[in-house]
């Protein structure tokens, strides 16, 4: 990352939109002819160092799509797309038909398949001085009603059967007349939303400060699993981004909510609050910024050059080149300790509760314990939930060994059966994660928002159930007091995960009535449709990094309460910031569960 030029006298205006960035990259074998001894396998020498195909392991969608492959070669090359079936122009090379030595993008456009026949095309490539080789075979499914109907009937039928048995409102659902042939991606919204207020706890209404105020949404969902190792993810490494107009002349910026540790963007030096105003040399304006947001969201691979400003300092701009790729997912977005007098304040920002990443959580809890923290600020503003077991593990470290035999959560299923989880572990005092070290705390400071839900809210409610003081800063939490079991089904080699709402949760006192969320004790953003009455109208987002209390207003208020000074509504002038603590994680075990933004319980077969 380097500084490139200055922008002077530019006022900052409000945030207006957000979008998740995801992408994936797949490593390919390296074939280095310079390091191979001559043998009988000379024919495998291709001159291709690596090849990344974002469509590897799946079929091309019948509606058509555009993919960008990345190839590294030892010399110039020529590529050809060979059509094996279907009309001659249904798949075309849009970019990269020829290229020089090194890295090149090969873009392929697949048209919609309006026939009832499967189509195949093969990407061939010949590097100068090497033999012609096949890089990939692409298969596109037919769009005929029969194939689509079979898939919909399988997946909808699978969901329908489970909803009839285990859905928390199964009796009311059973009264519906459902069409199993509709698009399976619309099945849940179509029928579960039609139930009205009966199942309002399965979702709710978007809040006034959202993009869809007052509209209904549901939690129950089905999603296709795209890989076998959920711990390994791909892309640029950005979390959500929000768009803001940064000049009166219409210059737009895409501000990053956070950057995953160990990701390509993290390695390139980018961080939370960086505001991108150019992508590959193109200035973002009100007429093109949305297309770039979409491009970054859907691009599974590729290299981007970003020009951006940092910490709302519009006098200096930076540039970074980021190449999408695979990396180990880490739900710990930031961890730090700040010593202030007699206080050693731990600050932990956690994106979700993911059993695949338990070793990260174990490691950071161990480090907080070894640092002998006296106070903890747990930032859950972007944490939509996840595994009950991991939420239990972290909360037990906060509550301490004195509460190991107290109830963490009571789970009640549709049939009336209940299970009682202790802070020690559960059900039956055993969830496989063990007992966390006692952090020696007597209270907890939580930063929450409308993005704090499910297993994150279990932390708050379970501690309230044992009269352990919890103070919330930021905004009202989501209010998801129901959870789901997860099951899988396969269809023609593709795996789908279904997560319907199947149980309610309550704490040791029997309290679970928080469908409107937990209110903040110190409100930073009241989440209404006006920015004028907010102490921080960007919250939960920011133009600064996690540890900068000048931008992280909720963090500053919690810090001020801990050290016993009054709050200031003016921007902080304090120069000290939280500094990250070293991360000591060295290894990972085989993944156990997927990563999901809900309260996730064991499937029925594992209970």
Where are these regions (language model features)?
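A short beta-strand micro-motif common to beta-rich folds, especially ectodomain repeats
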Residues: 106, 116-129
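C-terminal "post-core" interaction segments
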Residues: 343, 347-348, 358-363, 367-375, ...
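Extended, small/polar residue-biased N-terminal targeting/export presequences
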Residues: 150-253, 301-303, 309-334, 596-601
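Surface-exposed binding patches on compact interaction domains or structured appendages
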Residues: 47, 74-107
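C-terminal, low-ordered peptide segments at domain boundaries
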Residues: 277-373
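PDZ/PDZ-like domain segments forming the peptide/carboxylate-binding groove
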Residues: 231-278, 282-285, 354-360
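Solvent-exposed, low-complexity, repeat-rich "mucin-like" stalks and linkers
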Residues: 42-83
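Bacterial Sec-dependent N-terminal signal peptides
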Residues: 2-4, 13-53, 129-153
């Amino acid at each position: 990352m380097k500084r490139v030029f200055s922008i002077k006298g530019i006022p900052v205006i409000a945030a207006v939109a957000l979008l998740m960035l995801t992408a994936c990259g797949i490593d390919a074998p390296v074939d280095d002819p310079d390091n191979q001894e001559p043998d009988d396998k000379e024919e495998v020498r291709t001159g291709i160092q690596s090849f990344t195909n974002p469509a590897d392991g799946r079929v091309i969608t019948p509606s058509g799509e555009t993919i960008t492959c990345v190839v590294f070669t030892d010399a110039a090359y020529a590529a050809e797309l060979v059509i094996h079936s279907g009309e001659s122009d249904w798949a075309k090379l849009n970019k990269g038909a020829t290229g020089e030595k090194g890295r090149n993008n090969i873009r392929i456009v697949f048209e919609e398949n309006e026939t009832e026949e499967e189509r195949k095309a093969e990407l061939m490539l010949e590097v100068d001085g090497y033999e012609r080789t096949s890089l990939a075979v692409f298969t596109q499914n037919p769009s005929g009603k029969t194939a689509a109907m079979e898939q919909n009937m399988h997946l909808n039928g699978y969901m329908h059967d489970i909803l009839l048995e285990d859905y928390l409102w199964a009796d009311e659902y059973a009264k519906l007349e459902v069409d199993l042939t509709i698009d399976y991606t619309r099945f849940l919204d179509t029928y579960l939303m039609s139930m009205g207020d009966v199942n309002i706890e399965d979702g709710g209404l978007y809040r006034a400060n959202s993009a869809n105020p007052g509209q209904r949404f549901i939690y129950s969902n089905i999603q296709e699993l795209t890989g076998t190792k959920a711990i390994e993810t791909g892309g640029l490494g950005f979390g959500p981004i929000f768009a803001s107009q940064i000049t009166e002349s219409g210059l737009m910026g895409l501000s990053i909510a956070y950057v995953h540790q160990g990701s390509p963007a993290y390695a390139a030096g980018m961080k939370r609050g960086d505001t991108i105003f150019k992508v590959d040399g193109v200035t973002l304006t009100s007429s093109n910024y949305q297309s770039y947001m979409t491009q970054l969201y859907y691009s599974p691979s590729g290299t981007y050059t970003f020009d951006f400003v940092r910490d709302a300092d519009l006098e200096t701009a930076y540039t970074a080149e980021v190449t999408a790729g695979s990396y180990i997912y880490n739900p710990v977005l930031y961890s730090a300790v700040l010593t202030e007098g007699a206080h050693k304040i731990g600050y932990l920002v956690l994106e979700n509760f993911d059993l695949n990443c338990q070793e990260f959580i174990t490691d950071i809890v161990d480090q907080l314990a070894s640092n002998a923290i006296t106070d903890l600020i747990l930032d859950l503003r972007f944490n939509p939930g996840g595994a009950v077991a991991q939420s239990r593990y972290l909360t037990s470290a906060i509550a301490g060994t004195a509460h190991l035999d107290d109830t963490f959560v009571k789970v009640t299923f549709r049939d009336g059966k209940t299970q009682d989880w202790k802070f020690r572990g559960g059900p039956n005092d055993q969830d496989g994660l063990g007992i966390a070290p006692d952090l020696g705390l007597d209270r907890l400071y939580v930063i929450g928002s409308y993005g704090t839900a499910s297993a994150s809210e279990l932390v708050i409610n379970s501690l309230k159930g044992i009269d352990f003081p919890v103070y919330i800063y930021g905004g009202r939490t989501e209010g998801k007091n129901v959870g789901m079991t997860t099951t899988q089904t396969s269809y023609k080699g593709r795996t789908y995960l279904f997560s319907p709402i199947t149980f309610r949760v309550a704490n040791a006192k029997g309290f679970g009535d928080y469908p409107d969320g937990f209110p903040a004790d110190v409100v930073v953003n009241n989440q209404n449709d006006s920015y004028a009455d907010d102490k921080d109208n960007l919250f939960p987002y920011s133009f600064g990094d996690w540890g900068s209390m000048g931008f992280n207003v909720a963090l500053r208020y919690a810090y001020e309460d801990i050290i016993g000074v009054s709050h200031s509504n003016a921007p902080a002038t304090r120069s000290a910031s939280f500094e990250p603590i070293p991360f000591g994680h060295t290894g990972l075990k085989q993944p156990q569960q997927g990563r999901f933004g809900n309260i996730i319980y064991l499937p029925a077969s594992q209970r």
